[in-house]
């Protein structure tokens, strides 16, 4: 079975990688799908985010990195995936993600959403938190992969 793990991943965090690595044994293939959202002003280009994630997941043989725009369920259908993978940190994530799962189901009956609870050490972590810390000169080396922290420091220098 193929699973899609969609997100902006701007930047990819250790929490994202935790979800990816824990999903690998559960599915034949995991596609990490980087969203191209024209309404957001990203820190990194889609191409750079794909490069960052590819570097971090190169040891995972059944992980593929791609990008998409538009509806996630349409992308999943195009890729032959029946599962959307989502990480949950806190209760408010669950409320938002459950609503989205129900919405996606109305768009395509063939899609299921699988939730993975974030490992406790990453329960506070988000890309927004990383960007805010970095913007004010704080260290993010314990929050993102090494290659990503270098890119972040380069961006803010």
Swiss-Prot record:
Q: One Pfam annotation, family name?
A: CTP_transf_like
UniProt keyword Ion transport present: no
Q: Which GO MF terms are attached to this record?
A: ATP binding; pantetheine-phosphate adenylyltransferase activity
Subcellular localization: Cytoplasm
| Functional pathway | Cofactor biosynthesis; coenzyme A biosynthesis; CoA from (R)-pantothenate: step 4/5
Residues that hold ATP according to the record: 8-9, 16, 87-89, 97, 122-128
Which reaction is recorded as catalysed by this protein?
(R)-4'-phosphopantetheine + ATP + H(+) = 3'-dephospho-CoA + diphosphate
Q: What is its EC number?
A: 2.7.7.3
Identify which cofactors the protein needs according to its UniProt entry.
Mg(2+)
Q: Where is this site: Transition state stabilizer?
A: 16
* Assigned GO CC terms: cytoplasm
What general EC class does the enzyme of this chain belong to? transferase
| Cited Gene3D superfamilies | HUPs (3.40.50.620)
Q: Name one GO biological process term.
A: coenzyme A biosynthetic process
Q: Which UniProt keywords apply?
A: ATP-binding, Coenzyme A biosynthesis, Cytoplasm, Magnesium, Nucleotide-binding, Nucleotidyltransferase, Transferase
The record's family statement is: Belongs to the bacterial CoaD family.
Q: How does it assemble?
A: Homohexamer.
Function of the molecule: Reversibly transfers an adenylyl group from ATP to 4'-phosphopantetheine, yielding dephospho-CoA (dPCoA) and pyrophosphate.
What is the protein name for this chain? Phosphopantetheine adenylyltransferase
Q: Which gene encodes it?
A: coaD
